[in-house]
């Protein structure tokens, strides 16, 4: 995959070359998207819209830390949707990891989550965030136990994953209508890189075959159900709904 690669660390240790080789990235000087190694983190920038700033994964500070400390925890809609109740903390495969926010929420309340991400740039951002998170004295211990990254396409990986999870979570990219500054900024940068998930409909059936309990699909409230498969089971929040489908129980 071609992208502009930039190193702003001032170091001469070849870290950017190692990163490019690991994720299969080629430097393209004229690419409007840039992956930038800064002294703090790895970030994605849209070079023709510098005011949008950089997108990076931060599990330790910022909005994620605030959500972990002061958010709804088990009361969050995503936690309810995957079926967390009492001592039941399902094993989850997040098949469309993105920036890892929902996966982190589930991990922070006790679920083991395997994140799948096929885009190498997004996977590199997630890996950078995980590396910093794993090293953090406060959250590193449980984060290493509960949150892992698998760089692979969900369309193929969903048939290969073992052991089978109880829940598969899907949040395919869908064009956003909201005008909120955060969504606008992040989605403009993000969609410029990955575009809409045009093949997302193909995820529902393999997800249902893989999950032993349920599949949860997050959709904007104005979006049709994934693959046009309606379900009476949904958790509705402001602006979104979590459609819930039955999985395929383990056979004895």
Swiss-Prot record:
Residues annotated as binding S-adenosyl-L-methionine are 101-102, 117-118, 153-154, 171
EC numbers, comma separated: 2.1.1.242
What compartments host this protein?
Answer: Cytoplasm
InterPro entries per the record?
Answer: 16SrRNA_methylTrfase_J, SAM-dependent_MTases_sf
Enzyme class, spelled out: transferase
Any single Gene Ontology cellular-component annotation:
cytoplasm
Its main localization is cytoplasm
Please list the reactions this protein catalyses: guanosine(1516) in 16S rRNA + S-adenosyl-L-methionine = N(2)-methylguanosine(1516) in 16S rRNA + S-adenosyl-L-homocysteine + H(+)
* Gene3D superfamilies listed in its UniProt record: Vaccinia Virus protein VP39, YhiQ-like domain
Cite the entry's keywords alphabetically: Cytoplasm, Methyltransferase, rRNA processing, S-adenosyl-L-methionine, Transferase
Instruction: State the Gene Ontology terms under molecular function.
Output: rRNA (guanine-N2-)-methyltransferase activity
Tell me where on the tree of life, at the top rank, the source sits.
Bacteria
What's a Pfam family in this record?
SAM_MT
Give the similarity note.
Belongs to the methyltransferase superfamily. RsmJ family.
Q: Which PANTHER family match?
A: RIBOSOMAL RNA SMALL SUBUNIT METHYLTRANSFERASE J
NCBIfam families membership: PRK10742.1
Record's function text? Specifically methylates the guanosine in position 1516 of 16S rRNA.
Protein name as it appears in the record: Ribosomal RNA small subunit methyltransferase J
Recorded source organism is: Salmonella newport (strain SL254)
The major lineage groups are: Bacteria, Pseudomonadati, Pseudomonadota, Gammaproteobacteria, Enterobacterales
